């Protein structure tokens, strides 16, 4: 039996239409976590990646058959590679070599060309991305310095948080910072609803750049890399640090105790939120993020 065009247009969707509207999971009486691993590729980065590419199409910067390029620790690259496969673009990803094998495998699975630079060398990855984009006329997604990254969370993630906490006192947002898009986008929107809300940034103890320290190698992939571009430190109430081993331990305990298996940055977020609640006894609620799924870190745990 043939499927009619009417059925195709009313009953079927491209997978990218399923980005966002992720559920909220209760971690404790005070802490809720937005389950971003339910986005199509399993991470929060589907939100800004789609927003950036949609805008590029609308403004005439991108068309089918073009090439996009990005520097990434993995998740944003995976989102761009997936969207490129869905929409008919070629995709080049520049990535430090010490990222997980699972992330690299996913990028290649979606058809992206992976270009590796030295361990932890995000500045090198960004510089190479910019050079290749300019020399070849490719679309530079530019996640680390792109205001659309912030806008995607302002219009999407933060709106969903407001809907969930309607009628309740939301006091803190605790989140790791990679580009800083989630932190700044949520701050911009949530300020209007909760004028007293405070943002707690979380970074790896081994790379405490926001705390005034030196960058270093760490295992909390997706955090501690590039936040200097988008984060306005005047809007950050506190910076907390979590070690890689503590974050991994929290991931494993969460899986064994609740059946929720998330990535290492999510373990860091939960642990930081728990420590904040224990030390500060907030009156209101705390929201954090389960940024991605745990399967892409099996080789790292």
List each model region and its residues.
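PLP-dependent amino-acid enzyme catalytic core
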Residues: 1-301
């Amino acid at each position: 039996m043939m499927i009619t065009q009417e059925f195709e247009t009313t009953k079927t969707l491209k997978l990218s239409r399923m980005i966002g509207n992720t559920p909220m999971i209760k971690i404790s009486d005070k802490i809720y976590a937005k389950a971003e691993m339910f986005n199509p590729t399993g991470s929060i980065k589907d939100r800004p990646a789609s927003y950036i590419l949609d805008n590029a199409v609308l403004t005439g910067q991108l068309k089918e058959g073009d090439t996009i390029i990005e520097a990434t620790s993995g998740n944003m690259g995976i989102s761009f590679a997936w969207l490129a496969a869905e929409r008919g673009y070629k995709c080049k990803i520049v990535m430090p070599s010490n990222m997980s094998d699972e992330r690299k495998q996913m990028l290649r699975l979606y058809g992206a060309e992976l270009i590796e630079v030295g361990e932890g060398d995000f500045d090198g990855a960004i510089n190479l991305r910019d050079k290749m984009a300019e020399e070849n006329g490719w679309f530079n997604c530019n996640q680390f310095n792109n205001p659309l990254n912030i806008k995607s969370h302002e219009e999407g993630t933060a709106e969903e948080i407001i809907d969930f906490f309607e009628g309740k006192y939301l006091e803190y947002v605790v989140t790791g910072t990679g580009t800083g898009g989630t932190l700044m986008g949520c701050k911009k929107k949530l300020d209007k609803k909760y004028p007293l809300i405070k943002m707690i940034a979380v970074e790896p103890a081994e790379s405490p750049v926001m705390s005034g320290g030196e960058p270093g190698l760490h295992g909390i992939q997706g955090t501690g890399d590039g936040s200097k571009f988008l984060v306005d430190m005047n809007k950050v109430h506190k910076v907390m640090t979590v070690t890689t081993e503590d974050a991994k331990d929290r991931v494993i305990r969460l899986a064994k105790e609740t059946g929720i298996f998330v990535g290492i940055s999510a373990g860091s977020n939960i642990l930081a939120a728990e420590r904040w609640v224990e030390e500060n006894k907030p009156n209101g609620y705390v929201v954090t993020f389960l940024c991605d799924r745990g399967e892409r870190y099996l080789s790292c745990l």
